[in-house]
């Protein structure tokens, strides 16, 4: 599946580049894969995740074959996130990583995240997020953390145990079980109006809204130029963090859709509170 894309990245004013990313066009499985991992407390967790998460996911898909049934891909992706988290713990590192992964095939999309790496679609003149920023002060995240005996302490920003400004991540072994690797996974079909996607670390989103990013990327035209413009704009607005931006040109992909707008068919989130039916 040929999808045109652009990538831009910068270390910012940080001592180390802790972001990693990957683009894969898997002809055998028919999947196009785009991933961004934003590390913290070191780069090892992000590097491990970039190396193993999608590899594990693709292996599970091959093992399941065509008879996996409804929800199999989402469950396989959840397993990949949890297996990656175990591999990070096995390496003995205390580093962690936010993550967002997007997979496209002829039948639809699968998007997942932990933490504050974000996937945003353009839909006509508006932005639609496929991910949720997992912040500790979200009521459902605070309730989950406190039910496990943890705390959310507001310093400069709300932090788990006064330390981490996100409630879900890969790694961060010292903060378990309060910081969970359980991903939020969204499955569905893109519509003809979904002609552009942005995947980026929070170095971008801290200074640009989703709507601003989509507008800038669309006006830039080519995906490589769009990624460059987004990174440069974020830096110009004062972002000092690592920034990684991937822009996907989905015009050809979305044009074949039988739907006009985005259609979500399933959300899998085992860490979310169970609501009464």
Each language-model region and where it sits:
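PP2C/PPM-type serine/threonine phosphatase catalytic domain
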Residues: 1-277
